[in-house]
Amino acid sequence: MASSAPSAPGLAPVAKPPPPPSKVKVATATVPTNGKIKQGARPMRVSAPPVEPRRRMNPLQRLAAAAIDAVEEGLVAGLLERGHALPRTADPAVQIAGNYAPVGERPPVRGLPVSGRLPACLDGVYVRNGANPLHAPRAGHHLFDGDGMLHAVRLAGGRAESYACRFTETARLRQEREMGRPVFPKAIGELHGHSGVARLLLFGSRALCGVLDASRGIGVANAGLVYHDGRLLAMSEDDLPYHVRVTHDGDLETVGRYDFHGQLDADGTMIAHPKLDPVTGELFALSYNVVSKPYLKYFYFTADGRKSRDVDIPVGAPTMIHDFAVTENYAVVPDQQIVFKLQEMVRGGSPVVYDREKASRFGVLPKRAADASELRWVEVPGCFCFHLWNAWEDDATGEIVVIGSCMTPPDAVFNEPSQSPEEESFRSVLSEIRLDPRTGVSRRRDVLRDAAEQVNLEAGMVNRQLLGRKTRYAYLAIAEPWPRVSGFAKVDLESGTAEKFIYGEGRYGGEPCFVPRAGAAAEDDGHVLCFVHDEERGTSELVVVDAGSEAMEEVAAVKLPGRVPYGLHGTFIGANELQRQA
């Protein structure tokens, strides 16, 4: 019988960790590719498949597989989907065009050229996640449906030592690679209307017949990144995290699907933005279920990886929750207007629904609560925040202050604009939201005081050494022209002003990553890192900006050996942390 570690208050006992799963080794072979995918084209990749045994099917399974394939080609693709125009949010010609198109894997390239001077204090690796479909879509495809790929640049001693990009070897990716085509449903791009119902039935039939194995997870791990307890975790909210190791030569190696040593259910999930407390080392997280209750759960892990008991958060319907916030003592959980209604597919619509009758609200819960008895809801009318950048407690007023970007229309990322002209223009307004859990009253205001300076701000961060505490600055992507990112803004949350760094004509990037200088006294003493792509030249680089300088000057740019597609979220792992990897 496995021994158990002593249980801390509110924590479930933890079984002795099993040995780590075997590493995934990837053999590489250079294959030229322009990174473009055409509908129906064969996939192109830089890496050869990992050496792994092929799935062996018995004669009945082979017969079932052939029958299901015939139904897919004849009924679903041939009848339900043929001739149907795709919305822009599900059209591969839009979603993976230009620099959104996927690239192949690349093993470490060493000795990268640098213009300017790299600060010696940047000692570690910058890693950024993103969606990068291995196979050409067979039907609808949304950017968020792509397989997760990590891009990593190793910096040390004022040098850019290496660059590499690798797929996160999810169970889904490995099975689809073996089969040579996509067989798992694409949650946003495919699950619309009757064809979406049909594709869910195809998936269920393949799983039931043993043609594919859904028990090992169905996620793509393409969104968030966090480094906790010696592990870099790649995440998307449709699965458990995946543990990825940065090797000594700057490569990326998938260790496997990570359940925190059996503390998370094998069929469970964790959202893409868990919160790491910089003081205690605890990791706080949510998990939502779109089918059955409890629809939402809250839990946390100690610095050494011991999990708390789940707290069931009472919500009336399955709700899309991509992000949340923590303060020193509380978790702030949004329950907003984007909900899941799977029955809408039967009526020909999308299961991701903007519920105009629902009142947006935020739940305030003690961070280490054992149950939801102390949860307090505060309504915030007309508010949908896809991301929350920080939160803290205002001792003078008793309020919880939340900094987030309020998006309109709320479903802009997922669905086509409505027929209402006033709702067709996308806006993402940086907002200060004040919650009073004692009275249930909220206040909201735009952070940028000058309306003429208002820009769409989405994707970014504060100084993560101050997460959950009051911060003065936030570093956020300027999402203009939407969905491209033309630069980033350093926003002064106190004065309501912003200093902007624009990448230049025809140059676009993504989320800015703020890296504080070791031992810095000033909150903004550090550098902002971001991948930037020149669409005219077809080149990509890692731009380094001095965040503390008056004009936010670019101090260096690392020339990268290949195109880096526009992606999602990133993190910086210091050299000392790399040495302590599990």
Swiss-Prot record:
Entry keyword Oxidoreductase: yes
Gene Ontology CC terms, in alphabetical order: chloroplast stroma
Top-level taxonomic group: Eukaryota
Binding site residues for Fe cation: 273, 322, 387, 569
Cofactor: Fe(2+)
Main location: plastid
Subcellular location: Plastid, Chloroplast
Induction record: Induced by abscisic acid (ABA) and salt. Induced by D-allose. Induced by infection with the bacterial pathogen Xanthomonas oryzae pv. oryzae (Xoo). Induced by drought stress.
GO BP annotation list: abscisic acid biosynthetic process; carotene catabolic process
Compositional bias ranges of the Low complexity kind: 1-14
Transit peptide, residues from-to: 1-64
Entry keyword set: Abscisic acid biosynthesis, Chloroplast, Dioxygenase, Iron, Metal-binding, Oxidoreductase, Plastid, Stress response, Transit peptide
Disordered, as annotated region: 1-53
Keyword Lipid metabolism applies: no
EC number: 1.13.11.51
PANTHER family associated with the record: 9-CIS-EPOXYCAROTENOID DIOXYGENASE NCED4, CHLOROPLASTIC (PTHR10543:SF97), BETA-CAROTENE DIOXYGENASE (PTHR10543)
Protein name: 9-cis-epoxycarotenoid dioxygenase NCED4, chloroplastic
Organism: Oryza sativa subsp. japonica
